[in-house]
Structure formats: structure tokens, C-alpha cells
Amino acid sequence: MELNGFLRYKKLFIVLALLFTTILIVSLSLLAFALVVKTNGSELGVVFHQTEDNTTVIQGRSIVEQPWFIPTVAGSFGFSALAIILGLAIGLPIVKRKEKRLLEEKERQEQIAEQLQRISDQQEQQTVEIDPQQSQAQPSQPQVQQPLQPQFQQRVPLLRPAFNPNMQQRPGFNQPNQQFQPHNNFNPRMNPNMQRPGFNPNMQQRPGFNQPNQQFQPHNNFNPRMNPNMQRPGFNQPHPNQFAQPNNFNPNMQQRPGFNPNMQQRPNPSQLMPKGGLKP
């Protein structure tokens, strides 16, 4: 407890120590200043001594023999003692008050902890009264050694009542319908009443349906892929007195102005010889 009080109120002890140190330093500095002044400026502190050689020696008195030595030392010690007494007189009551407050707070926390413990005990008693079986000790279960590898048990399929082989069929269930008998040349998967008339093999063809058109007969020297009514005169037709021109050239077609068909092809610039003074 004393250690915790010292750690919590260390600021107070630091202030008291600084006060005591300040008073001590002030008293010692006053003592040193007085010694210096008395030694250097006092005329009464000079003593003449005559030796055997009839020579005079000037010596000063020692500090202890000075008349101000005793009062100065006594005053410095008095200030130090006064600082210690004041520090203890001020600090001790404050520390005692703080310790007393800490003790009261600790007792209060202990009381609160006891009350909480009582409340928890009462709640446990109520739960035990409501369900006494929980308070009984459960028997220890025997330890069973488990295999290292898992064992898979075979599952037995459950038979539903609809799949019972001994169960008789219900009337009208999964019975063939006598009205829908299979027809000749008919797929049994298709209902004959749903057959369209266009798919009846015994039905005659309608006139004009899927019959070749007699008006569009193939012409001589004509591509069968092209409609003859769409052929234009003088288009891609060979001349009877001339040979066939390459690239389907029509001789009856007028030439465009400025276009010479006999003009030779210009040479490729990349195939020309390099000229002098130019980089290749």
C-alpha cells in the first residue's frame, strides 16, 4: 500500500524535494558569498608576523576565527532544518489523506464485489431449483477407441409405397387407352387425332404446289442461275464475228475518253535503275 501511494503521489514528493534543495542551495550560496567578502574586504583580518630575520610577513586570519563564521553556518543549517520541517508538516497530512481515500475506495470496491457475488449465487440457486436435473453429476462416458480410417456404412434405400411390387395397380392408372389404337404408317409417339392434313401420305397434292413453272424455260447461252427476264442486251454476250475478249470485255461498249486500251503498262518505280547523284 505504501509503495502504491508513493507511486501515485510522486509529484508531491518531487515538489517537496525541489523546495528543500532550493533552500539549501540559497543558504550555501549566501555562506560562500559572505566568506569571499569578509576575506577580501576586511581590514581587521590582516596580521603582521615578525620572523628571526627581522622580516615582516602579512597573513590573514583563518575563516574559523572570523566573527561572522558561526552566525552564517548556524543560519544555513537553520534554513535547511526549517525546509525539512515544513516539507514534512505539509506533505505528511496530504499523504495520509490520500491513503485514507484509497482505503475507503478499496473497501467500497470490495463491498460491491461481495454484492455481485451474492447476486450470482442467488441466480445459480434459482436455476438449480427450476431444473434440478442439471445439478446432478453426469455419469462418465466410457472411452471408445476410434478407428484411424473412417468406416462407411452401406445405406439401405427406403422403398416408397408407390414402388411396392406387391401393391396392386389402381384402376385407370397406367392403363392403355382403347380409343387410341396405332394406325398404319404412323409413328406411335404421335396422337393420330393431332395429325395435320398436310402430312397425310394418302392426301393428294394441291394444284400449283411444288410444281415446275413452264414459263421459265432455260435459254441458249444463258447461265441457269440467272433469270432470263433480267438479262440486259449487250451485257456479257459474245460477238459472233469476234473472238472472246479477256476479262469479259464487250467490243460494242464505247470507250471512255482519255483511256487508251492499247497503252502499255507503266514500269514499276521500284524496278527502275538508280540515277546518278541519288541515294539508292
UniProtKB/Swiss-Prot annotation:
Signal peptide region: none
Keyword terms, alphabetized: Cell membrane, Cell projection, Cytadherence, Membrane, Repeat, Transmembrane, Transmembrane helix, Virulence
Subcellular location: Cell projection, Attachment organelle membrane
Repeat (Sequence) residue spans along the chain: 163-168, 170-174, 186-190, 191-195, 196-200, 199-204, 206-210, 222-226, 227-231, 232-236, 249-254, 256-260, 259-264
Chief localisation class: membrane
InterPro entries: Cytadhesin_P30/P32 (IPR009896)
Protein name listed in UniProt: P32 adhesin
Lineage: Bacteria, Bacillati, Mycoplasmatota, Mycoplasmoidales, Mycoplasmoidaceae
